[in-house]
Amino acid sequence: MARGPKKHLKRVAAPKHWMLDKLTGVFAPRPSTGPHKLRECLPLIIFLRNRLKYALTGDEVKKICMQRFIKIDGKVRTDITYPTGFMDVVSIEKTGENFRLIYDVKGRFTVHRITNEEAKYKLCKVRKILIGTKGIPHLVTHDARTIRYPDPLIKVNDTIRIDLDTGKITDFIKFETGNMCMVTGGANLGRIGVITNREKHPGSFDVVHVKDSIGNSFATRLSNIFVIGKGNKPWVSLPRGKGVRLTIAEERDKRLAAKQSSS
């Protein structure tokens, strides 16, 4: 019988979007407990070593982190298996680089560089709103932040913009039709579009219909929707492709066209 927390993660059982090959070893870094779920996060070590190629081994990542070079959401993190997740801002002051963890249309975390100006804030989805002790209202976000005394107009599923220096809410976007959203789970993970309508199913999952910028429509559960902008204006910069998923044939044609133009 297992007693206590699991401390290991086999490479074969690691989430597919980490893109670890099966033959390099037996184990994968098991993310520490933190603000994002194990299957929905990217450990810091994989981001620095496998994505940015700033280190060759786990030991080198540890040396980088222990020199306090890496900040996540404005806080220094020295744990190499710290779970970074959707919308987190990773800053490396030594190189003057800032990254926002955001999904590409294949559902993987992409290396998305952002400006210093954009690195000062992040967007968070409101998961719960509760009244705490002594009648103090709280809201809980997707990255496990608890914020007291929020604006009473903010409801569950809305998106708030948080200033990372102060941790205060500076603005918010309502969850409503016509707003821009990104899908953060399910088969359409990473796609971006405008909310067209919401089907309510009491006792089951609400379904949201989304239309992307080239006119393709798709539907997903309400829990997978993350509002990222008012109307067609996103509040964060978007990765290449702008969240439009192409069919296999369209991707092939695009590759061939790029090949011909370069030759």
Swiss-Prot record:
Superkingdom of this protein's organism: Eukaryota
Biological processes per GO annotation: brain development; chordate embryonic development; ribosomal small subunit biogenesis; translation
Cellular component terms (Gene Ontology): cytosolic small ribosomal subunit; nucleolus; small-subunit processome
Signal peptide range in chain numbering: none
Ranges in a coiled coil: none
Chief place of localization: cytoplasm
Keywords: Cytoplasm, Nucleus, Ribonucleoprotein, Ribosomal protein, RNA-binding, rRNA-binding
UniProt cross-references to HAMAP family, sorted A to Z: Ribosomal_eS4 (MF_00485)
Function: Component of the small ribosomal subunit. The ribosome is a large ribonucleoprotein complex responsible for the synthesis of proteins in the cell. Part of the small subunit (SSU) processome, first precursor of the small eukaryotic ribosomal subunit. During the assembly of the SSU processome in the nucleolus, many ribosome biogenesis factors, an RNA chaperone and ribosomal proteins associate with the nascent pre-rRNA and work in concert to generate RNA folding, modifications, rearrangements and cleavage as well as targeted degradation of pre-ribosomal RNA by the RNA exosome.
PANTHER family tied to this protein: 30S/40S RIBOSOMAL PROTEIN S4, SMALL RIBOSOMAL SUBUNIT PROTEIN ES4
Protein name: Small ribosomal subunit protein eS4
Gene name for this UniProt entry: rps4x
